[in-house]
């Protein structure tokens, strides 16, 4: 066990990030289990502890008697300095065991700009970065999460990649590891990887060869062995009603980003927003019943003492039994001062009655996501809402006592013009004027938050070349010039960070050396504006003979092989191409959840179904139309 000396620990910010011992944390004697796992998250404690996936994995592994999972997060700059000064290796929170002593180190990957933190954590742990330099004396490196659907830029660092939902997959892998470990890994590391590659949803990068053309374009990625699958199909949980859910999560000692109980209403989203990668990755929609959700809420509140429950899914307001669930939660917790919160809502799903109910305990502003300023642009991205929808929702809100509205938009979308940007300012002014008209007061406020569009894999825009950073900055200045009212605040994201994110989002294996060079030059916590160094990143690319524009700004041909083609989210390329063509013509595609099948291919490919409770009972939609 690593000893933490208070003589120096008191000099770092928030030492509770590193001490462990939180309520509901689980400590096991490593000598009594067969498999030890460190769950890594490449960001600071407050961000990592807010992530539901970590909570699920932590509870999932620790419910087994033969395994233990402990947590490890990226140390903040001051803590890293102290650790390096004192030769303290990266350690787990629960038992302060050096990370290199675990059997498995499993990272959750949410964001491309956290990749250098992975390298920094490996270096602090004394673990070689490249998989080829590690034998079984070191932990097996595993990763999962949305970035796994194009893991190629970091594939050289990882041994095993989990594609899809990991509850069943994790148990299968632990069982195999336990059995092979007991036999002494007779086939060595490669032999074990060939066996684990047989588990559906498993990608082992070392078992594949990558080929490029003479011009330097990606050509193919092929398995090195006949028993290794050419493509890896994602795993899903069909029965989300009864799947494991963490009702006894670790309660942190310090404030974290999302410090509350979380209810996952359903998985998947079929709204079909064309910019949205998550809506493609997590199909099909599978709901939990209100009764199951109420029980989860009761257990979690009893086990944690939280005073807030967040209703979380990709589009929470689309939950078919939302009014009933809210009534059940409010009745259960009405005398316990436990509030219920909803994230940003789709405008067409908004119910002022629900909003009023959930804010009986604590009242806050309302958040909507029109995404674009004009109807043409909203149709292009398949948002499927109108200005009338937004103004009607705001009218109801203002009449019911709300004074604050936050609006989310995106900038740099395909076919976007300055007229579309002007529409953002126009909408903000209309909402503000509406408040004054309804209330007769001038205390209304509108927050306009505009992000820089990053094309992502497995979406209809995966072929689209991102707009030039200087053009984005021009657009940001233009929009700012149109907003001149102290009651409208305007926030926008840095274009340079989005540029690097796009390069890694659509990158190939050659980018691993760029990451190493950038890390050597001091890059880490790149998702934090104050630590991102654009010039250092450009130099890292140049030193490796690569250009970020090749990955971020280049529009691909439909027939061009893509570095992530072998990582199958089961949404067909034909469907994505059809959606691109629909976007160019500004045509809408309906939601297959309550309309005819749109032919994305997920349900028949996975032999599964949409699970919805709209009609009162469980409805499994299993008919398919388009191919």
What is the predicted role of each segment?
Residues 74-222, 460-508, 516-531:
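Glycine-rich beta-alpha loop elements in corrinoid/cobalamin-binding modules
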Residues 37-43, 58-61, 250-275, 301, ...:
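N-terminal pre-triad scaffold of radical SAM enzymes
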Residues 51, 255-291, 599-616:
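Canonical Radical SAM [4Fe-4S] cluster-binding loop centered on the CxxxCxxC motif
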Residues 7-38, 45-46, 205, 211-262, ...:
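N-terminal [4Fe-4S]-dependent radical SAM core
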Residues 77-78, 153, 209-213, 320, ...:
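Flexible glycine/acidic-rich beta-alpha junction loops that bind and position SAM and/or redox cofactors
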Residues 39-42, 113, 299-406, 410-447, ...:
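Conserved SAM/AdoMet-binding glycine-rich loop
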Residues 276, 556-626:
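Cysteine-cluster motifs in flexible loop/terminal segments that predominantly coordinate metals
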Residues 1-15, 64, 604:
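Helix-enriched interaction subdomains in cytosolic or periplasmic regions
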